[in-house]
Curated annotation (Swiss-Prot):
GO biological process terms on file: microtubule-dependent intracellular transport of viral material towards nucleus; symbiont entry into host cell; viral penetration into host nucleus
Keywords: Capsid protein, Cytoplasmic inwards viral transport, Disulfide bond, DNA-binding, Host endosome, Host Golgi apparatus, Host nucleus, Host-virus interaction, Late protein, Microtubular inwards viral transport, Phosphoprotein, Viral penetration into host nucleus, Virion, Virus entry into host cell
Lineage, uppermost ranks: Viruses, Monodnaviria, Shotokuvirae, Cossaviricota, Papovaviricetes
Compartmental location: Virion; Host nucleus; Host early endosome; Host Golgi apparatus
Protein's job: Minor protein of the capsid that localizes along the inner surface of the virion, within the central cavities beneath the L1 pentamers. Plays a role in capsid stabilization through interaction with the major capsid protein L1. Once the virion enters the host cell, L2 escorts the genomic DNA into the nucleus by promoting escape from the endosomal compartments and traffic through the host Golgi network.
GO molecular function, a single term: structural molecule activity
GO CC term (a single one): viral capsid
PTMs per UniProt: Highly phosphorylated.
Gene name of the encoded protein: L2
Source species of the chain: Human papillomavirus type 63
Subunit relationships: Interacts with major capsid protein L1. Interacts with E2; this interaction inhibits E2 transcriptional activity but not the DNA replication function E2. Interacts with host GADD45GIP1. Interacts with host HSPA8; this interaction is required for L2 nuclear translocation. Interacts with host importins KPNB2 and KPNB3. Forms a complex with importin alpha2-beta1 heterodimers via interaction with the importin alpha2 adapter. Interacts with host DYNLT1; this interaction is essential for virus intracellular transport during entry.
Alphabetical list of InterPro entries matching this protein: Late_L2
Keyword hit for Phosphoprotein: yes
Keyword Disulfide bond assigned: yes
Highest taxon of the lineage: Viruses
Listed name of the protein: Minor capsid protein L2
Length: 504
């Protein structure tokens, strides 16, 4: 049988693993560590001769560091490598046209040769020297006189030019007035800054009207709060209802009215009653192949029922919630698929009760009114019934308890006609009495003969018992005595027709 030889891995892949275990094949170890026969010859021979840079060894020939150099060629070529492109030399001088083209257009009517004149170029240097004037002429202050006119003397010399700089800093507490007037005829410019604290400052910001915080008269009278929704009010805001159970996209909302949902929720899922704690979750392990109806149809296919959660309903009542998981579909792999249902039940509500009117005990006016209603539109009203007042203590006979004998009158009970004069009256909405007719049917005479029997008629009076002579024919005499008022009767069995019995 021929076997295909599997190719061994490369020596570079085998050597790192076998070196650790110290079980490398000799050929691989000598090749990697360069201890073959050829490597040893080169190592020993290099002691006497120089073979530097040739790359002679057990590896593949690469021509050394600089490659093989063919005879008669100065360039070195590496075997198996790419050719090195030759970079051209950079030109020293720029290559381009040296003739200058004319810019202006030529006149066709002019001569063919235009002689150009050389214009000498001259450079004019302009130097501006400023000589400041040390002595400033004094201008006398003019005086005014009513009889003489004002004369302004203007000097012939022009004033020297000066550079004036100004730095202004705004301060809202002061108002700064800066003025600089340079007019002709003045020897110098004046820059006057006036700072006056009497002038009003600049308004900065926005004018906001103030709010009047006067709340008016405060009442010191206390108010009685009667609209309490909880027995212990809290200042913190209470969450109305948990939002995680009321998402109709993920949970089915199922209201529950059975009281067992509070104390024994397991009885709604299965017919058994296992022992459990109220505050823990319930897990119902049942085979899905066995179709069993739950006591409550809302809890069918339930396999998990969480612990109770208390919250506040939107109408203010306390709500008990449980989260259930159904196992409606079961796959072959045992995975169950079902929806999640939110079962909730509103327990109670705390509202303000109306005041209860108390009745006075121990007093009776002798007049009683009884009211009731069979429907909202047909009330039943009872007329006033006058009850006789109770007899006074003087009407009773005082009997000594020490006496041994009592009369019969003391043992008789007194009959009090209480309620004998009551009248029941049914009236409609408008108050008109409604008369109800009770039909009374008289008794009809009974059908058929009454006291039917055998009568013996004798035309003559006879004394004693009559004599009856029996006949020879022995005929049974059947007497049917009818004494009923309904007219029904029963036949004697001898008068009924006999049935033929067929035996098979």
């Amino acid at each position: 049988m021929l076997r295909v030889r599997k190719r061994r891995a490369a020596p570079q892949d085998i050597y790192p693993a076998c070196k650790v275990a110290n079980n490398c094949p000799p050929d691989i170890q000598n090749k990697i560590e360069q201890t073959t026969v050829a490597d040893k010859i080169l190592q020993y021979g290099s002691l006497g001769i120089f073979l530097g840079g040739l790359g002679i060894g057990t590896g593949k020939g690469g021509g050394g560091r600089y490659g093989y150099t063919p005879l008669g060629d100065s360039g070195a070529v590496r075997v198996g490598g790419r050719s090195t492109p030759v970079r051209p030399t950079v030109p020293v001088e720029t290559v381009g046209p040296r003739d200058i083209l004319p810019i202006d257009s030529l006149d066709p009517l002019g001569p063919s040769v235009i002689e150009l004149e050389d214009i000498p170029a001259t450079t004019v240097e302009v130097v501006a020297e400023v000589h400041p004037i040390s002595d400033t002429p004094q201008i006398p202050a003019p005086t005014t006189d009513e009889s003489s006119s004002a004369v302004l003397h203007i000097p012939q010399e022009s004033p020297a030019a000066r550079t004036i700089t100004r730095s202004q800093y705004n301060n809202p507490l002061f108002r700064i007035t800066a003025s600089a007037d340079i007019a002709s005829g003045e020897a110098s410019a004046s820059d006057n800054i006036f700072i006056d604290v009497d002038t009003p400052g600049q308004i900065v910001g926005q004018e906001i009207p103030l709010v009047n915080f006067d709340m008016g008269p405060i009442s010191t009278e206390g108010e009685l709060e009667t609209e309490f929704t909880t027995s212990t009010p809290r200042t913190t805001q209470v969450q109305e209802r948990p939002t995680r159970f009321y998402n109709r996209r993920y949970y089915e909302q199922v209201p529950v009215t059975a009281p067992e949902f509070i104390t024994r929720p397991a009885s709604l899922v299965t017919f058994e009653n296992p022992a459990f704690e109220r505050s823990v979750s319930l897990i119902f392990e049942q085979d899905l192949e066995d179709i069993l109806n739950a006591p409550d149809q809302d809890f069918r296919d339930i396999v998990y029922l969480s612990r109770p959660t208390y919250s506040r309903a939107p109408d203010g009542r306390m709500r008990l919630s449980r989260l259930g998981r159904r196992a409606t579909i079961s796959t072959r792999s045992g995975v169950t698929i079902g929806a999640q249902s939110h079962f909730y039940m509103d327990i109670s509500s705390i509202s303000s009760n109306d005041g209860i009117e108390l009745q006075t005990l121990g007093e009776a006016s002798g007049e009683t009114v009884v009211q009731s209603s069979l429907a909202a539109s047909d009330p039943i009203e009872a007329e006033h019934s006058f009850i006789e007042p109770a007899p006074s203590i003087d009407s009773y006979d005082i009997v000594s308890l020490q006496s041994e004998t009592y009369s019969d009158e003391h043992l008789l009970d007194m009959y009090e006609p209480v309620g004998s004069s009551l009248q029941l009256q049914i009236s409609d909405v408008r108050g008109r009495p409604t008369v109800i007719d009770i039909p009374f049917r008289p008794r009809r005479p009974p059908l058929g003969p009454i006291n039917a029997g055998v009568d013996i008629y004798s035309p003559t009076a006879s004394v004693g018992s009559p004599t009856i002579n029996p006949t020879d024919l022995d005929i049974p005499l059947i007497i049917i005595h009818l004494d009923n008022s309904t007219g029904d009767y029963d036949l004697h069995p001898s008068l009924r027709k006999r049935r033929k019995l067929v035996h098979i």
